[in-house]
Structure formats: C-alpha cells, structure tokens
Amino acid sequence: MNLRASLTATLMLAIVTFLSACDTTGSPGPGVTRIISTTSFGMCMGYCRTQLEITPVKAVLVREPGGRGAPTLPVQRFERPLAPGEWQSLAQSAASARFAGLPETIGCPDCADGGAESLSVTDARGTKAVNFDHGKDVTELQPLLNQVRDIRASLTPKE
C-alpha cells in the first residue's frame, strides 16, 4: 500500500472512531453509576427537602426539616438494599431516558408553593439533570421517574 492510501485509511478510521463516540441520543450511557432525585417545598412545615440517591447496591433517602416551625426536627436517613435485578431495571430506564432537548428547568418549580422535583443520572460521561414541578410527568423520563418515585415512597415513613 502506498503512503497516500495508508494515510487515507488512517484518516477514515479516525473519523469513524470519532463519530461513533459522539452521543446523538442525549441519553445517559449504559454505564449508569448513580441516580439522584430531590424534592423541595419552600413554604412548608416539617420535612421540606428530600434527596434520594440510588446506586447499584442501595437506595438512600435523606429528609431535612425546613420552613416554619421545624428547626428542631432531626435529619432523617432511610436506606435499603436494592432487590435482585432492580438496579439493572433502573439503569436500563436511565439509559433510555431522553434528556436531550429538555431544558434544565421545566415549568416553574416551587412557584405558588407547588414544590420542586429534580432527577439526575450520572454515567462515565457526566451527569444529566432536569428540574420540574413536583409530581408532574416528564414524558421523556417517565419510566425512570415512575421507578424512582416508587422507591422514594417505599422509604418514606408513613406519618
């Protein structure tokens, strides 16, 4: 092979490699390592903020007091191991979530004390996140959002 053909082949291989590495889906990659969901309410009494962190082995929910009349409440922490296959299902839903095209904030989270919610997914390429009105559906994220909300409900104490 002459030098020109060799350089052309090398250049083509580099272009194909570069293009195949581009993320055109806007979805987290298959190596999802963490999913975080938060809720917050600006004008509330009692536990006003929560953070749910889900990793391949467990789910941890932290509830923090805030608002009016709650400064003496302790921070609460609840955790449970994930059931067999639960992380795989979450990671698959996270990898299928369509963050591309979504703005960083949807609607007006916590306006008129409706509460705010967020969802973020971390993989080897970084973190994709979105904030939105508490309890609202986000079609592009819905399967994952449903699973995360179910885990939050399972860890939240009945008051």
Regions found by a protein language model. Name each.
Residues 63-101:
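A short-motif feature that recognizes glycine-rich, charge-decorated loops
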Residues 9-18:
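Bacterial N-terminal signal peptides
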Residues 27, 38-71:
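N-terminal secretory signal peptides
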Residues 2-7, 22-44, 49, 78, ...:
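Short, well-ordered, aromatic-rich surface patches in folded extracellular/luminal domains
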